[in-house]
Amino acid sequence: LYTFCKKIKYQEKKAVDNVSFEVRRGEAVALFGKNGAGKSTILKMITGVCFPTKGKIEVEGRVSALLELTSGFDPEFTGRQNIFLKGQLLGLKDSEIKELEQTIIDFAEIEEYIDQPVRTYSSGMKARLGFSINVNIRPEILIVDEALSVGDEEFKNKCTKKVNEIVNKDEVTLLFVTHSTALAKEFCSRGIVMQKGKLTFDGEIDEAIKRYKKTVKK
């Protein structure tokens, strides 16, 4: 990512102010900061939801973003049809989606509801399906924004294990936004600390955690 910023014009506030960093293939990086630090804005710019006011962002690889897990579904489509819809939007061929279909259904634990319209699903069911699609479509870049709190404790552990697996075994690049320093340390070797839209630290994960904790105490 080259130096960029995002200005919120109605308050003349820069949500992200002259931030520049690079994440290499296979690297796992935690992004820390208090609410309003600019973390989610960075993720939205990386995924193309919004764009920087100046500067540029370059992304090389298939991005799977665990941001708003229940968004992007067609409520009138069945769960199965939505798997194909989201897979196509992520650039997969129908044959590739078909190969992954049962794995996605099994992970989401919604087999008996998969051929019902998504509008009949609970928010938890939609979140589980959204998570399952995004982690099982063989992403090259995985972006996670506090999405590991899906479902009950057993399913949360399952989600954590899955992210760990694809990051370690599949050489997926991970950008992980979290307030959990324990999870960040489990997944990542590098940490970036944001404060009031500015990047204040970029380096080894233990030091990043120390710096982040100091910002929380302020």
Spans of model-derived segments:
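Pre-NBD coupling/linker segments of ABC/ABC-like ATPases
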Residues: 1-15, 205-217
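Conserved ABC ATPase "signature" region
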Residues: 1-3, 84, 96-113
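The feature captures the beta-strand-to-loop junction immediately N-terminal to the Walker
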Residues: 32-34
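H-loop/switch region of ABC-family ATPase nucleotide-binding domains
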Residues: 178-179
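A short, surface-exposed alpha-helical micro-motif characterized by mixed small hydrophobic
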Residues: 184-186
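Conserved ABC ATPase "signature" C-loop
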Residues: 196-197, 212
